[in-house]
């Protein structure tokens, strides 16, 4: 019922209940059912139903929680957030870029190094579409 109240009040077409349902399903598939996100994280939206408040919740609670769950495996975090299928890069909470490892280290190296670099994209948190595209 908390989420129904929030869904009625929050503007710009964002469904917090759908966000939670889809993200929790993805977490259950990628990790387990014991580590899903509770609706209590979103309770403050009842008093202040706004994208600004939702952004605060994601930046300060949801993203750090996902970083902890997935040991900063940003590829999995991107999957939970739907960033792999967003219509435009501006809606991605986490963006990646390919690293040219041989260029960085000048030649062949025998060390296992990630070939992508990840960055949290602050401006995505203020865009309603970033949240809508988690579940669409």
Region spans (language model):
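C-terminal regulatory/interaction module of P-loop NTP-utilizing enzymes
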Residues: 1-136
């Amino acid at each position: 019922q908390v989420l129904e109240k929030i869904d009625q009040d929050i503007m710009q077409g964002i469904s917090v209940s759908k966000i939670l349902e889809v993200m929790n399903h993805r977490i259950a598939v990628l990790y387990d059912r014991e580590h899903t996100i509770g609706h209590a994280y979103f309770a403050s939206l009842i008093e202040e139903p706004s994208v600004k408040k939702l952004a605060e919740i994601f930046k300060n609670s949801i993203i750090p929680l996902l970083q902890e769950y997935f040991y900063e495996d940003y590829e999995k975090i991107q999957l939970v957030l739907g960033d792999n299928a967003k219509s435009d890069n501006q809606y991605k909470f986490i963006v990646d870029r390919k690293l040219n490892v041989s260029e960085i280290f000048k030649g062949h190296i025998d060390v296992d190094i990630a070939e992508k670099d990840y960055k949290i994209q602050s401006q995505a948190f203020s865009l309603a579409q970033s949240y809508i595209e988690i579940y669409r």
